[in-house]
Amino acid sequence: MFGLSKMLRVGEGRAVKRLQKIADQVIALEDQYANLTDEELKAKTEEFKDRLAQGETLDDIFLDAFATAREASWRVLGQKHYKVQIMGGAALHFGNVAEMRTGEGKTLTCVLPAYLNALEGKGVHVVTVNDYLAKRDAEWMGRVHRWLGLSVGVILSELRPAERKVAYDCDITYGTNNELGFDYLRDNMARSLNDLVQRGHHYAIVDEVDSILIDEARTPLIISGPVDGSSQWYNVFAQIVPQLTRDIHYEVDHRKKTVGIKEEGVEKVEDLLGIENLYAPEHSQLVSYLNNAIKAEELFERDKDYIVRNGEVMIVDGFTGRVLAGRRYNEGMHQAIEAKEKVEIKNENQTLATVTLQNYFRLYEKLSGMTGTAETEAAELHQIYKLDVIQIPTNRENQRDDLTDLVYKTQEAKFAAVVDDIAERIANGQPVLVGTVSVERSEYLSQLLTRRGIKHNVLNAKHHEQEAQIVAQAGLPGAVTVATNMAGRGTDIVLGGNPDILLDIKLRERGLDPFEDEEAYQVAWEEELPKMKQRCEERAEKVREAGGLYVLGTERHESRRIDNQLRGRAGRQGDPGATRFYLSMRDDLMVRFVGPTMENMMNRLNVPDDVPIESKTVTNSIKGAQAQVENQNFEMRKNVLKYDEVMNEQRKVIYSERREILESSDISHYIKNMVDETISAYVAAATANGYVEDWDLDKLWNALEALYGPTFTWQSLVDGSEYGAPGELSAEDLRTALLEDARAEYAKLEEAVTALGGEAQMRNIERMVLMPVIDQKWREHLYEMDYLKEGIGLRAMAQRDPLVEYQKEGGDMFNAMKEAIKEETVRQLFLMRKQFVKQDEEANA
């Protein structure tokens, strides 16, 4: 990975120079576009569309379109793109990741490429990490696009399908990665063209691209439905596990996140259940319940890995600190945690449709992204998504002071020192942002601050709705904000307060909405913004004198990038600022990787609990541990992708055929091919031995009877009545006779249905039969593929490559599924033929 990163950086230098040249050319057009009237500037949109319609390309109108959007942003928002923002916008248009430091205005940067690419009329998707940011950006940046005559939509979790379709039909659509991915899956489960909401995957700009394409890449998007299963065993084992003792009855590997039951544990569980052998075939499922119950107890921590809200267990993303709404652990893990927390146990689910974010975003013809920290992941973004990372220079020189880590023996001593440091900083009027690794830690620190009488705001998965308001005020003099890792990411902490967000809050309190009352909102905005900016600037000056924003990390994250993101909140736009991490020997990362050596040394030297050490050994150990974990996670994501690649190719085939069937007004040729291929497959299987006397024609006819019901017997063929002397019947003769018979019977079905409702009715029936069969067989296939993947690792014990075996067996299973779709569709259609015959007989009786 290191070598690739180095090579990428070499090419990056040339790219930056090219972007600087482009930005200079756009800036050179500033006076020309500033002299246009509002009407003339707005008319540019139609002019650009006409030029594209006449054969020009986006690159031909690139400079003019950027200059137009830049001038419109100034007139509508009072914000003009800096040179570095134009560079970032150009990098996005060319399909790169623009790495722009916190505070450099990524949201405004996005306006330029979104406007340019929307002119093609194929749709632009701007992807954010949560509903709030999607709605905020659609409202704020959407004001520029709407002013220029483009339509803007936003996909929110509560929208109905019809509303989603309207939003996707807009020129520019804002939404979260989850909502876009789930809509893609739902579209590929639709039974009617009217149920489709997305119109394709043309161009996506992914905000916080590292969070979406890397941190969340290991977790697939899954639409599932309940399956039958008993929840009693989850409760039984939730009561058994607390009676077991770690290291005596079972062992835990926190690094690998695995558990193992020991012989003593097996005996104890057998006694508690009153059974003889836990591993007997009739008890085989109990081992899975036991393992999940132990994992729920040992590896899943409340308020860190999940929270319980309104009687529901909700997963917390370990990287972002945000709740993953609608996501559930699979393979019974979620139910085991529900049993542990004594809340309602919901049914286990069967996968109906699934896709990884990696493969969803690779659907786009052009993909780009923005982030403040992507350099450490440049190689992964290039290998998996073919995205190059370009570091955009800062608008002003960075003045942030990154102080050395302080290491304490205990967590209690560490947090006491943290509170002391906060108290000292705010006494001087300096705002403080405190980063924690979990909801639990943020609330623990909140309690300590409350005891000291220190006013503060808490920003974590439990307080998601107040996120913007809290972050907008985090830069006020003496403000204290406690946040989980990336809570609040996407919203700048501006020294003195964020004037845009504070004004938006004020206008909404007055009852003005940028969507509903766009004109009145714009008038009030232009009137109030200068006053709000002045008030914030006066406060900002006081904060600068106090040293700027102080960012305090209470623990190192296993990813350097997450640490860098936290640090990056300080020192935006050339402001002063400082950062420091407080660590303890009992922090998760220290326990896992630094080990007891350092703690033993501190004990030997009699270092008091409240005295920190600054050690290069510890710092280097942490860096090494982070690099090790990052490499492990990268390998895991690559492994997920390799296995999902098998499913992805199969998914593309099924979804493509499904869409073709959905869009076709006449699928009779599909059905007739299915009839021919199914009959041919039956005959081929029955006549594989080659000699008539070896054929099991009774078995073949029984199968054909269940399939469609031949109008003649095999004896009538073999006895020579139709094919000369007995024994001269060939497999091809048999196939030809059966094909003619089946086709004739299907023609009778078509005649009967057409007589009742016309030919269109027959075509509708064919589609109504085929679509549910495809969906049912695909669901069964997904289940079987999951089952195959669970056990495929054991093939390594037989010196076979699990991935190769998975590809081979998965391919065989996919081919079998396609045959099963044909067979079941043909069977159901001929069943209708039999029903028509029966109705005729009853009518004539």
From Swiss-Prot:
One of its GO terms (cellular component) is cell envelope Sec protein transport complex. SMART domains: SecA_DEAD, SecA_PP_bind. It is an enzyme of class 7 (translocase). ATP binds at Q85, G103, E104, G105, K106, T107, D492. Disulfide bonds: none annotated. It is a peripheral membrane protein. Part of the Sec protein translocase complex. Interacts with the SecYEG preprotein conducting channel. Has a central role in coupling the hydrolysis of ATP to the transfer of proteins into and across the cell membrane, serving as an ATP-driven molecular motor driving the stepwise translocation of polypeptide chains across the membrane. This is Protein translocase subunit SecA 1. It comes from Corynebacterium efficiens (strain DSM 44549 / YS-314 / AJ 12310 / JCM 11189 / NBRC 100395). The lineage of its organism: Bacteria, Bacillati, Actinomycetota, Actinomycetes, Mycobacteriales. The gene is secA1.
